[in-house]
């Protein structure tokens, strides 16, 4: 995350204080004052004046901001991002135990693991979880020609997701059956394992090869580009625990409608305008409508799955971060099991 091009480093005492300020604010929803912090006794051994000065420093570097309703301070958007990145505890042992128990000795695919984990976490912790996938990462695994009659044939396509697609192809006068068979054979040789999002480009690149073997190659080429390989990139989202975001008190109803529409149909990862550093893999956005998004991508073979947590600005970020990390851990464990099973089968 790019903290407005600032290198923010807090010493231990200040880190403890700032962490407690944020967590108190998230728990109470109220501005935090120095007197209240002294009364809480976090073992800082500081007077109200000293804590007030430290809070003023936090304000100067943009981590805190003044509240409009009291003399206390509240975390800024920058402060909340800093907390999530560096201070929110992403290790929830209780949640981890519950999930381990749930998945013990269950044979699930990686996709099933992600969906069940997201659903379970939303129920256990009370978070709104969103899982997303798009077909642009799917690849062509098989293409077959089936002749119905002299005027019509069917092209059967199998994608890496297991999805089978049948498309009719009209046998125009300019398209000879033998030429069509040659074209399909070339496509099998050259396009298998190509991403669906790249099929148009890769098919056009075969023009010189088709030209050598097929008389009316342009008609066949256009037929496949326009009618057969016309895959639209689509986003599929599953939302779990939707009621949790609906019941958030600090999000206005008119904003909620827009948020629900967004999380049901859009890539949250792509929605978040955040500069991600190479070593980071969680995006966070604190939005003007008082909602917050945390999103993570997980690579699974030839596709990317996206997992997100959606809540109010005052949601429990530690649990949200923990949820994302736990799902990634479960996926990694599932990968190891699948690899072990494949090796056993080979023996």
UniProtKB/Swiss-Prot annotation:
Entry GO MF terms: DNA binding
Organism, as annotated: Mycoplasmopsis pulmonis (strain UAB CTIP) (Mycoplasma pulmonis)
Family: Belongs to the HrcA family.
Transmembrane segments: none
Role: Negative regulator of class I heat shock genes (grpE-dnaK-dnaJ and groELS operons). Prevents heat-shock induction of these operons.
A single BP term in Gene Ontology: negative regulation of DNA-templated transcription
Entry protein name: Heat-inducible transcription repressor HrcA
Pfam families with a match to the protein in the record: HrcA
Record keywords: Repressor, Stress response, Transcription, Transcription regulation
PANTHER family referenced in this protein's UniProt entry, alphabetically: HEAT-INDUCIBLE TRANSCRIPTION REPRESSOR HRCA
Entry-linked InterPro entries: HrcA, HrcA_C, WH-like_DNA-bd_sf, WH_DNA-bd_sf
SUPFAM superfamilies: GAF domain-like (SSF55781), Winged helix' DNA-binding domain (SSF46785)
Gene that this sequence comes from: hrcA
Taxonomy, superkingdom: Bacteria
């Amino acid at each position: 995350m790019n903290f407005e091009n600032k290198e923010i480093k807090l010493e231990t005492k200040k880190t403890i204080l700032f962490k407690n300020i944020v967590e108190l604010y998230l728990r109470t929803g109220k501005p935090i004052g120095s007197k209240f912090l002294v009364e809480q006794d976090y073992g800082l051994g500081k007077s109200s004046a000293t804590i007030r000065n430290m809070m003023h420093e936090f304000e100067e570097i943009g981590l805190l901001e003044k509240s409009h309703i009291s003399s206390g301070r509240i975390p800024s958007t920058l402060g909340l991002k800093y907390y999530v990145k560096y201070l929110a505890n992403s290790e929830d042992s209780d949640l981890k135990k519950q999930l381990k128990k749930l998945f013990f000795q269950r044979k699930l695919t990686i996709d099933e693991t992600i969906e069940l984990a997201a659903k379970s976490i939303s129920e256990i912790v009370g978070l709104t979880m969103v899982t997303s996938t798009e077909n642009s990462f799917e690849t062509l695994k098989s293409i077959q020609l089936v002749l119905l009659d002299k005027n019509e044939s069917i092209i059967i396509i199998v994608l890496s997701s297991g999805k089978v697609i049948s498309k009719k192809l009209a046998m125009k006068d300019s398209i000879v059956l033998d030429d069509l068979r040659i074209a399909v054979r070339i496509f099998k040789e050259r396009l298998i394992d190509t991403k669906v999002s790249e099929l148009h480009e890769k098919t056009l690149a075969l023009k010189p090869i088709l030209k050598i073997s097929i008389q009316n190659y342009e008609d066949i080429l256009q037929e496949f580009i326009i009618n057969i390989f016309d895959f639209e990139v689509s986003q599929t989202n599953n939302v779990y625990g939707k009621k949790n975001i609906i019941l958030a008190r600090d999000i206005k109803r008119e904003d909620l409608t827009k948020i629900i529409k967004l999380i049901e149909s859009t890539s949250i990862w792509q929605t978040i305008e955040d500069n991600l550093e190479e070593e980071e893999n969680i995006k966070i956005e604190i939005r003007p409508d008082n909602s917050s998004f945390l999103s993570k991508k997980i690579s699974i073979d030839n596709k990317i799955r996206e997992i997100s947590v959606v809540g109010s600005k005052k949601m429990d970020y530690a649990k949200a971060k923990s949820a994302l990390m736990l799902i990634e851990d479960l996926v990694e464990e599932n990968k190891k099991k699948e690899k072990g099973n494949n090796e056993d089968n080979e023996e």
